[in-house]
């Protein structure tokens, strides 16, 4: 059995990450990770008439870029696993409709990309696929409209309010690759911390990701593990 413990899976043959792609908005381009993004947008609408259409276009461009960088063609991709924050995952569904690839829609909020990597790796390790395209997206303006208030209302936001990323990350997973590899995954459980502050949505992730990290027998994440361990006990 490949399952290890209650939440983890060990892959018999590590799954390779063949390529990655990322497209982000102008605000993300002002941050310390700017040099690592493939494309930084200057127009948040991407020439479209709505934020939702802009996000769909963002998804399309990012996923196509990941496939292009992999050296494969869309015909070589067995499945797409992607998700976003919008109703019916329209960012993903409209974004990939022209790719003509079997699609699994995911809705895991901030965990969507990790969820896609884990499930994609399971498909490959189980010999159900050779190549899997994954993605996750969000758009600040579309998310504000979905979860808080449309920007057009001019509603005041606290300076400490969580700011949703405008961007899409994508990757191609493969059975045969040179690495890096996905060798194991740990799936989080639902932990309801009773957070009711709509301006602090990031804190909701803390309970689910914190427990697996703290219960690890070895510090796999280097400084990240140490920092998380420190704040967990404060």
Which sequence ranges carry the predicted segments?
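A glycine- and small-aliphatic-rich helix-loop capping segment at beta-alpha/alpha-beta transitions
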Residues: 33-36, 92-102, 124-126, 147-156
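Condensing-enzyme catalytic core mediating Claisen C-C bond formation in acyl metabolism
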Residues: 1-52, 149-222, 226-227
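Active-site-proximal alpha-helical scaffold in enzymes
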Residues: 107-134, 173
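Residue-level marker for beta-strand->alpha-helix junctions and adjacent short loops that shape enzyme
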Residues: 24, 87, 139-140, 232
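Short beta-strand segments
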Residues: 18, 82-83, 132-138
């Amino acid at each position: 059995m490949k399952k290890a413990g209650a939440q983890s899976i060990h892959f018999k043959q590590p799954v390779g990450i063949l390529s990655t792609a990322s497209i982000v908005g102008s605000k993300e381009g002002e941050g310390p990770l700017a040099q690592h993004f493939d494309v930084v947008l200057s127009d948040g609408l991407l020439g479209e008439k709505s934020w939702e259409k802009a996000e769909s276009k963002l998804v399309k461009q990012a996923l196509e870029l990941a496939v292009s960088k992999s050296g494969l063609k869309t015909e070589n991709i067995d499945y797409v696993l992607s998700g976003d924050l919008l109703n019916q995952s329209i960012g993903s569904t409209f974004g990939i409709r022209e790719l003509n690839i079997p699609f699994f829609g995911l809705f895991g909020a901030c965990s969507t990309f990790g969820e896609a990597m884990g499930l994609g790796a399971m498909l490959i390790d189980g010999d159900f696929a050779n190549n899997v395209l994954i993605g996750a997206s969000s758009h600040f303006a579309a998310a504000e409209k979905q979860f808080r208030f449309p920007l057009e209302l001019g509603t005041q936001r606290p300076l400490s309010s969580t700011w949703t990323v405008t961007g899409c990350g994508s990757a191609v997973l493969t059975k045969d690759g040179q690495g890096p590899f996905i060798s194991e995954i740990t799936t989080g459980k639902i932990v309801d911390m009773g957070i009711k502050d709509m301006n602090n949505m990031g804190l909701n992730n803390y309970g689910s990701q914190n427990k697996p990290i703290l219960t690890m027998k070895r510090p796999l994440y280097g400084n990240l593990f140490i920092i998380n361990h420190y704040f967990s006990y404060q």
